[in-house]
Regions:
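Conserved anion-binding
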Residues: 60-77, 86-162, 176
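C-terminal alpha-helical cap/extension of soluble enzyme domains
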Residues: 182-246
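Alpha-helical structural signal in soluble globular domains
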Residues: 27, 52, 56, 82, ...
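Glycine-rich phosphate-binding active-site loops on the catalytic face of alpha/beta enzymes
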Residues: 31-42, 86-100, 148-158, 201-224
């Protein structure tokens, strides 16, 4: 159950449809993330269901939603403007490019609009060329009102975030982003055994989906696994540090 202290990482749980969300479970996480893996790596929910969840739980947890696997500049901006009217706390969008010019064009164009909702760029660590140009151009995000990046995996197979990006590299990335006043989240088939190590890196948020599912395809949520994960995540931080050093 949540016992978060200020400046500690937040727990994000991804839900694939409205049937998975129970009012009794809000106490186990900080951010309710609406993402349908059946529709893509960052597949989007239907608008009516997003609005329903926002109405139900906005006063109890924060709500984020993904816009879908849309990677064209025009498509992303259109979806960001649409989702900005939903009352969300965060809107997550991805980018899939090897071009610095395309990255800068997208981010600069986003910066011309005023969004009420916090924008979160999903950075796919298994797409090395995209990750590299983002890391080399961090200054453009803060300048254009994007203060949140989340490291994730695009391909949802047996590999996870740490398979592609070890904790030392993650810490270095978080430090670079901190200098630019950008918050970093971590996700990508993470499991309970990753919690201690990743919390010590002090990300803004750590996200889970696979870890709370009863099947390998991430289709069926297990409430028992959710409770176990929450207990692991919100256990005393000093105990986590002690365990890491043991």
């Amino acid at each position: 159950m949540k016992t978060n202290k200020e400046n500690e990482p937040q727990l994000l749980i991804s839900f694939r449809d409205i049937k998975e969300i129970s009012d009794q479970n809000f106490k186990y996480f900080d951010i309710c993330d609406l993402k349908d893996p059946e529709k893509g790596s960052i597949g989007a929910w239907e608008e009516k269901n997003i609005l329903n969840v926002v109405k139900r739980c906005k006063q109890r947890v924060r709500v984020s939603a993904t816009i879908g696997d849309i990677f064209s500049v025009e498509g992303i901006i259109k979806k960001l403007q649409q989702f900005d009217n939903f009352g969300l706390d965060y809107i997550k969008f991805g980018i899939n490019t090897k071009s610095v010019l395309e990255l800068k064009d997208l981010i600069n164009r986003i910066g011309k609009f005023i969004f009420r909702t916090k924008l979160v760029l999903v950075v796919f660590v298994d797409k090395n060329s995209t990750l590299k140009i983002i890391e080399e151009n961090l200054e453009i995000f803060y300048q254009n009102n994007i203060r949140f990046l989340i490291l994730d995996t695009y391909q949802k197979n047996n590999q996870n975030l740490i398979s592609f990006y070890n904790p030392l590299k993650i810490k270095d990335f978080i430090n670079k982003c901190s200098i630019k006043k950008i918050n970093v989240g971590l996700a990508g088939r993470l499991q309970p055994n990753h919690i201690t190590k990743l919390k010590l890196l002090n990300p803004y948020v750590i996200g889970f989906r696979s870890a709370i599912c009863s099947d390998q395809n991430r289709k069926f949520l297990s409430e028992q696994k959710l409770i176990f994960l929450s207990n692991q995540f919100f256990s005393n931080k000093s105990n986590a540090i002690e365990s890491a050093g043991a």
